């Protein structure tokens, strides 16, 4: 799926996850 969508769901779905962590996981 789209990386931005992945980051969005990561940020709202996992407490304490930073944008950088989500971006790393999603790319």
Swiss-Prot record:
Domain of life the protein comes from: Eukaryota
Record's keyword annotation contains Transport: no
Keyword Disulfide bond: yes
Keyword terms of this UniProt record: Disulfide bond, Secreted, Toxin
Annotated compartments: Secreted
Disulfide links within the chain: 6-26, 10-22
Tissue expr: Expressed by the venom duct.
UniProt main location, coarse: secreted
A GO CC term assigned to this protein in UniProt: extracellular region
An example Gene Ontology molecular-function term: toxin activity
Family: Belongs to the conotoxin R superfamily.
Domain notes per entry: The cysteine framework is XIV (C-C-C-C).
Designated name of the protein: Conotoxin flf14b
Source organism of the structure: Conus anabathrum floridanus (Florida cone)
